[in-house]
Every structure is written in C-alpha cells, then in structure tokens.
Swiss-Prot record:
Domain spans labelled HTH myb-type: 1-58
Protein name: Telomere repeat-binding factor 1
Lineage: Eukaryota, Viridiplantae, Streptophyta, Embryophyta, Tracheophyta
Matching Gene3D superfamilies: Homeodomain-like, Winged helix-like DNA-binding domain superfamily/Winged helix DNA-binding domain
GO cellular component: chromatin; nucleolus; nucleosome; nucleus; protein-containing complex
Species annotation: Arabidopsis thaliana
Single Gene Ontology BP annotation: regulation of transcription by RNA polymerase II
UniProt domain comment: HTH myb-type domain confers double-stranded telomeric DNA-binding while the H15 domain is involved in non-specific DNA-protein interaction and multimerization.
Coiled coil: 241-290
GO molecular function, one term: double-stranded telomeric DNA binding
Family, similarity comment: Belongs to the histone H1/H5 family. SMH subfamily.
Length: 300
C-alpha cells in the first residue's frame, strides 16, 4: 500500500499524467509496474493513483489542476476543438432573486438564435464513444472528459453521467465490459451523431445539459421571445404562487439528486468490488504458480 496523506509532488503528478497518456485512465496497476514510472510512484498504490486522477480531472470549481488533467486526457485522443461550443444552464424557478439573475444570464446578442431541437444526453454519450473509437470501449472518465471538453457541463454532470450510463446499459443501447462502454453493432450510430452534432454551431449559446431540476433525457432550447414570455409570466405571479412553484422545483431537484447520488454510489461500490476481485485473482495466480514450481522441483 502507498503512504496515505502524503502530499503529491510535482514529479509524481507529471509521472501520473504521463502514465495515463501512455496506458490510458484506469490502468493504475500497469502504470505502477511500468519501469518508466515505478521509480517515481513507488510510494503510491493503485488506489492513490485512482483518487489523485479523479481529483485532478473532476474538481467541482475552478480551472487549476482540473484543466491540466483535461489537457492530459485530450492527448490520448486527437480531436478538433469545437470553438466556443457550450451549454448554458436552463434553470427552473427557485426564488425571485434567482429569476433576476436568470434574466441577465440568459441575455443573448441582438440577433436572437433560431429555434433548435431538443438535445439528449445519451446522444452526447454516443457521440463521445463513436468519436473516440477506443478499443474495447470507453470508460466513464474518458466519456465525461470528452463531453466536458467540448461543451460546458453543469456542476452535477458526473452524477448525471453515471445515471445515464447505467440506464443506457440496462436498456441495451450500450454494452459494459470491464467498466468500459461500447455501442452494440446493431445500434445505428449516424442518427445519434446527427442529434449530438447538428445543434452546436455558432458562438452564442442558450442550450444546456440536464441539471437536477430538469429531465435527465431532454432539455428544451428556448428562443429569446420564449424567455421574455416566461419572465413576464413570473413577474405577474403573486408571492404565494411563486413560493409554490419554487417549492415544487426544489422538491423535484432534491429527488433527482438523491436518485443520481444513489446510482453513483452503486457504481463506485461495483468498481471497488471489481478491483478487489482483480487483486484477489492476482494473488491466487501467484500462489498457484508457486505451488506448481514446488511440485516440479519435488518431481525433479
């Protein structure tokens, strides 16, 4: 085991990034066994590498090491950067103060964008898997890094992604093998890619990925006139109506967040069990090899 609570050095972080570039995320044991990195990471375990990479790649706020980790993941697959591709959050009613903030946050240029069709999160997942074309499929970290790199995702994107991946696997749209996801051969990729790619053009954005207060499958894109109409309707509400709508939105958000959190916990538990089983299998294999060598020596 590694040394817990020991601060990571810059040299160790660089070795971890180089190892991920060379072997891919999730190959912690392979990175530790690689002579190129074992001399630097000898104090670290596969769990240490996994936790450090997760902290580097999915920090909740700011750029910092999160942006550095994105650059490291980007080097594993060469993708053309879609300039200014972003998704702005479409918020539900929460309070009068938030309504005022939403008014300023959703303002667009003098030329209002045309009406755009609904965008599904599963289309973005299919786009990521089809574009990366990794052998054996893509893991959750790689898929999330691709979507976050190409579009602006909400803070709770990791939990939404875990829930959506679990749903797509259960309904047969994705196949999960060794914590990697791939698209079955019978699934038409062109329709998914058209849905994911056809709506992200131009510099001004009012679209969004699902947040806890929106449906996990679809988010409606609104034109400026629709936004103005909605704001006018909100201003005409009395205090009791606004409070009731806000309370309902908060309740729906809490329910969605609880469901997503439960799904994320189940996924993490399954991942931990798989790693434990892999470690046990390796130890059992070593023991069996040792016994076979002893038997051969006795027979000789």
């Amino acid at each position: 085991m590694g040394a817990p609570k020991q601060k990571w050095t810059q040299e160790e972080e660089s070795a971890l990034k180089s190892g991920v570039i060379k072997h891919g995320p999730g190959k912690w044991r392979t990175i530790l066994k690689d002579p190129e990195f074992s001399g630097v990471l000898y104090l670290r375990s596969n769990v240490d590498l996994k936790d450090k990479w997760r902290n580097m790649s999915v920090m909740a706020n700011g750029w910092g090491s999160r942006e550095k980790s994105r650059l490291a993941v980007k080097r594993t697959f060469s993708l053309p950067k879609q300039e200014e591709n972003s998704l702005a959050l479409t918020n539900s009613l929460q309070s009068d103060e938030e309504n005022v903030d939403a008014t300023s946050g959703l303002q667009v240029s003098s030329n209002p964008p045309p009406r755009r069709p609904n965008v599904r999160l599963d289309s973005l997942i299919m786009e990521a898997i089809a574009t990366l074309k990794e052998p054996g499929g893509c893991n959750k970290t790689t898929i999330g890094a691709y979507i976050e790199d190409q579009y602006h995702a909400p803070p709770d994107f990791k939990r939404l992604l875990s829930t959506k991946l679990k749903y797509l696997t259960s309904c047969g749209k994705l196949v999960k093998v060794k914590r990697k996801y791939r698209i079955p051969n019978s699934t038409p990729l062109s329709s998914h890619r058209r849905k994911g790619l056809g709506v992200f053009g131009g510099k001004q954005r009012t679209s969004s990925l699902p947040s806890p207060k929106t449906d996990i499958d679809e988010v409606n894109f609104q034109t400026r006139s629709q936004i103005d109409t909605e704001i006018a309707r909100m201003k005409s509400m009395n205090v009791h109506e606004a409070a009731a709508v806000a309370a309902q939105a908060v309740a729906e958000a809490e329910a969605a967040m609880a469901e997503a959190e439960e799904a994320a916990k189940e996924a993490e538990a399954a991942e931990a069990e798989a790693e434990a089983a892999q470690a046990f299998a390796e130890e059992a294999s070593k023991t069996l090899k040792g016994r076979n060598i002893c038997k051969m020596m006795i027979r000789a």
